[in-house]
Amino acid sequence: MIDNTKIRSLLEEGLTAFQLDSIGDLLLDFLLLLNKWNKTYNLTAIRDIETMVSKHLFDSLAILPWIKGNHIIDVGTGPGLPGIPLAIAKPDLQFVLLDSNGKKISFLNEVKRQLNIKNIEPIQIRVENYHPNQGFDTVISRAFSSLEQMIKWTEHLVAQDGLWLAMKGRFPDTELVPIHQTYRVERYAVPGIEGERCCVLINNTNKE
């Protein structure tokens, strides 16, 4: 039995820290829908809905300060993380949510329909087969095992002056060694999560 009052309280506490108090209801609706679908379709390994608040919602929202531009793609979005929380927080930005898993894209289409989120476009395709008409201002992912792999598989998606934004746990010392583009690493804290979190911002400086 889910204690909605407790979940709402956890949400409100964290959203106050992010100065995003107004989006609590929509995030709660998303969380409840994710929890419901997860029981059947195994969309995320996290089963405890209270843990989802911090590890899914708050961890996603923590990278908001570093998003660049209006045209964003979340590669390997899974059940819409970080894309859905970001899209809810920034309804003026456009988000493409890319994943090759049909169950996850079906879930995202249901989220879009039920929650009436107009600024997302879920697309089922492998990243190497996706060739949009224009590059994205920010390419986000927490799905790749290394920064080098992220750049390799998504370099055709980023705009000439765009940005890669990779979500990491510990400071990725060894992953940064082969990176030739200019980058910076921002450490951040997430309400309810102990341990190191950081965001790697890599500028697309290799294109002519």
Swiss-Prot record:
One Pfam match, given by its short name, reads GidB
Top-rank taxon, per record: Bacteria
The protein's location, in the record's own words, is: Cytoplasm
Q: Quote a single Gene Ontology cellular component term.
A: cytosol
Q: Which InterPro entries match?
A: rRNA_ssu_MeTfrase_G, SAM-dependent_MTases_sf
SUPFAM superfamilies per the record?
S-adenosyl-L-methionine-dependent methyltransferases
Per UniProt, the keywords (alphabetical) are:
Cytoplasm, Methyltransferase, rRNA processing, S-adenosyl-L-methionine, Transferase
Against CDD domains, the record matches this protein to:
AdoMet_MTases
Q: What EC number is given for this enzyme? A: 2.1.1.170
List, in alphabetical order, the Gene Ontology terms for molecular function in this entry.
rRNA (guanine-N7-)-methyltransferase activity
Where, by residue number, does S-adenosyl-L-methionine bind?
76, 81, 127-128, 142
Catalytic activity line of the entry: guanosine(527) in 16S rRNA + S-adenosyl-L-methionine = N(7)-methylguanosine(527) in 16S rRNA + S-adenosyl-L-homocysteine
**Recorded family membership:** Belongs to the methyltransferase superfamily. RNA methyltransferase RsmG family.
NCBIfam families listed in its UniProt record: rsmG_gidB
State its role.
Answer: Specifically methylates the N7 position of guanine in position 527 of 16S rRNA.
Kindly give the HAMAP family that the UniProt entry links to this protein. Answer: 16SrRNA_methyltr_G
Can you say what this protein is called? Ribosomal RNA small subunit methyltransferase G
Question: Lineage from the top down?
Answer: Bacteria, Pseudomonadati, Pseudomonadota, Gammaproteobacteria, Legionellales
